[in-house]
Amino acid sequence: MIIFTDVISGDELLSDAYDVKLVDDVVYEADCAMVNVNNGDVDIGANPSAEEGGEDLEDGTETVNNVVYSFRLQQTSFDKKSFMTYMKGYMKRVKAHLAEKNPEAIEAFENGAKTYFKKVVSSFGDWDFYTGESMDPDGMVVLLNYREDGTTPYVAIWKHGVSEDKI
């Protein structure tokens, strides 16, 4: 299994247990699901009994995003201006990391990041934002949106801002 770990904060953000796809050679996207959680147990709602009336939630049960829940991501918020300011600083931190670890990837990162960043900004109101468990303000902000079907959530993380740790 591969765990995607933020190179700035050290937070675990995603794993290949989810269907991870590389987009524009700069962002990993993974579809998520909304699941029911009861006292730490996860119920994905599969195979409900024919006698049950539906998926009524039991007391103490809540519906959560499985990636957000599994990696203990913390929701945060931005207006467009503060997000752009954050991203400018974050991109500098990732570029400094790449200069030290993988200088030949800097150009691909800069070009791909600009393209994906424009996509996010153009649909800014559709995105939710999460930090890693440590809530490090310098760390990566995980992006969450919905596919074209309007019901399938997905997360996006910056490829060059994570290390891929095999466990």
Curated annotation (Swiss-Prot):
Question: Cross-referenced SUPFAM superfamilies, in alphabetical order?
Answer: Mss4-like
Q: Does the keyword Cytoplasm apply?
A: yes
> What biological-process GO terms show up in the record?
cytoplasmic translation; negative regulation of autophagy; negative regulation of microtubule depolymerization
Superkingdom of source: Eukaryota
Q: What is its main location?
A: cytoplasm
Q: Which residues form the TCTP domain?
A: 1-167
Picking any one GO molecular function of the record gives: calcium ion binding
Give the function comment from the record. Answer: Involved in protein synthesis. Involved in microtubule stabilization.
Q: What is this protein called?
A: Translationally-controlled tumor protein homolog
Source organism? Debaryomyces hansenii (strain ATCC 36239 / CBS 767 / BCRC 21394 / JCM 1990 / NBRC 0083 / IGC 2968) (Yeast)
